[in-house]
Amino acid sequence: MAKRDYYEVLGVERGSSEADLKKAYRRLAMKHHPDRNPDSKESEEMFKEANEAYECLSDPNKRAAYDQYGHAGVDPSMGGGGAGFGGQNFSDIFGDVFSDFFGGGRGGQRGGAQRGSDLRYTLELNLEEAVRGTSVNIRVPTLVNCKPCDGSGAKKGSSPITCPTCGGIGQVRMQQGFFSVQQTCPRCHGQGKIISDPCDSCHGEGRVEEYKTLSVKVPAGVDTGDRIRLSGEGEAGTQGGPTGDLYVVINVREHSIFQRDGKHLFCEVPISFVDAALGGELEIPTLDGRVKLKIPEGTQTGKQFRIRGKGVAPVRGGGAGDLMCRVAVETPVNLGRRQRELLEEFRSSLEGDDSHSPKTTGFFDGVKRFFGDL
């Protein structure tokens, strides 16, 4: 069967950056890794295919040869004149790719103890909780060590045995033409041990699914995107490996009155056109209660007033921000007869005196000049 194009295997374009290649490979490797699909031959083949594609495209020289000559440029068995793979160690190439997921680099890929995966939990808060801080109980699905077998995967009274194929390393070296490649042991799937008499509770996995209830203390001043790390509250490791961490990611819901931008809060304050014209005093809501705000006469829509110290104190320290109040002058509706008469009288009183509406006068003067110049 003809080999698939390496770029097609990874699902990227030919001009993709190294970061894009690595991201695509990590996604495929996590999906098809033998440890996660122990009984799937298809996943094993796709994992190997992704390994081969990334091994080639992550090396600038091999990638250049592949781009020019295709598979013949990098595979000596196809008779091409390319650089080939030169006997480079498989685990040296991919150690950094798996370091975040399989226990910290190359050592984590071999048989033996492996660190548990980190978990992510999105915590929804309202604005008041985010600003003031709170304590929340959350329920998180995770993997914990199986109690009957104490995480070994073997039935009580028995023990896992060292894999005879890889000698407990979890990796086997495969000779391919002029070079050799290390691959996950197909018999123990990288664990280094074989369980001949599996535990009835976990079926040899060593871990079982469970919901944990945890108390999360949220500090005051957090914002959307902030993370709280709970060490050791992720998935249990395998074969005695350390437990991963839980990352609680904050998401602050929209507020009906306030919008937040960093440490500052913003709100829109509707006022009547009478208050805007004559001035007055308004009660403005803040997260700490109501405050008085003086509105000077002649206030226009869009005018912004600053109330100092009524914003948010940042979680990383520093003084509280401000509350910015933007005025929106409201046009009266549903007028009664007498109200209309009064407004008509008011309009008549303004005729011939442009000093009361300088912006309006300036605008229409500009319009006249514009059409006069045409």
Swiss-Prot record:
Residues 5-70 form the J domain. CXXCXGXG motif repeats lie at residues 146-153, 163-170, 185-192, 199-206. Zn(2+) 2 binds at residues 163, 166, 185, 188. Gene3D superfamilies: DnaJ domain, Heat shock protein DnaJ, cysteine-rich domain, Urease metallochaperone UreE, N-terminal domain. It is found in: Cytoplasm. InterPro entries: DnaJ (IPR012724), DnaJ_C (IPR002939), DnaJ_domain (IPR001623), DnaJ_domain_CS (IPR018253), HSP40/DnaJ_pept-bd (IPR008971), HSP_DnaJ_Cys-rich_dom (IPR001305), HSP_DnaJ_Cys-rich_dom_sf (IPR036410), J_dom_sf (IPR036869). GO terms for biological process: chaperone cofactor-dependent protein refolding; DNA replication; protein refolding; response to heat. Its cofactor is Zn(2+). Zn(2+) 1 binds at residues 146, 149, 199, 202. It comes from the Bacteria. Binds 2 Zn(2+) ions per monomer. SMART domains: DnaJ. Its main location: cytoplasm. Keywords: Chaperone, Cytoplasm, DNA replication, Metal-binding, Repeat, Stress response, Zinc, Zinc-finger. SUPFAM superfamilies: Chaperone J-domain, DnaJ/Hsp40 cysteine-rich domain, HSP40/DnaJ peptide-binding domain. A zinc finger (CR-type) spans 133-211. One of its GO terms (cellular component) is cytoplasm. GO terms for molecular function: ATP binding; heat shock protein binding; unfolded protein binding; zinc ion binding. Belongs to the DnaJ family. The J domain is necessary and sufficient to stimulate DnaK ATPase activity. Zinc center 1 plays an important role in the autonomous, DnaK-independent chaperone activity of DnaJ. Zinc center 2 is essential for interaction with DnaK and for DnaJ activity. Homodimer. NCBIfam families: DnaJ_bact, PRK10767.1. Participates actively in the response to hyperosmotic and heat shock by preventing the aggregation of stress-denatured proteins and by disaggregating proteins, also in an autonomous, DnaK-independent fashion. Unfolded proteins bind initially to DnaJ; upon interaction with the DnaJ-bound protein, DnaK hydrolyzes its bound ATP, resulting in the formation of a stable complex. GrpE releases ADP from DnaK; ATP binding to DnaK triggers the release of the substrate protein, thus completing the reaction cycle. PANTHER family: CHAPERONE PROTEIN DNAJ, DNAJ HOMOLOG 1, MITOCHONDRIAL-RELATED. This is Chaperone protein DnaJ. It comes from Pseudomonas fluorescens (strain SBW25). The lineage of its organism: Bacteria, Pseudomonadati, Pseudomonadota, Gammaproteobacteria, Pseudomonadales. The gene is dnaJ.
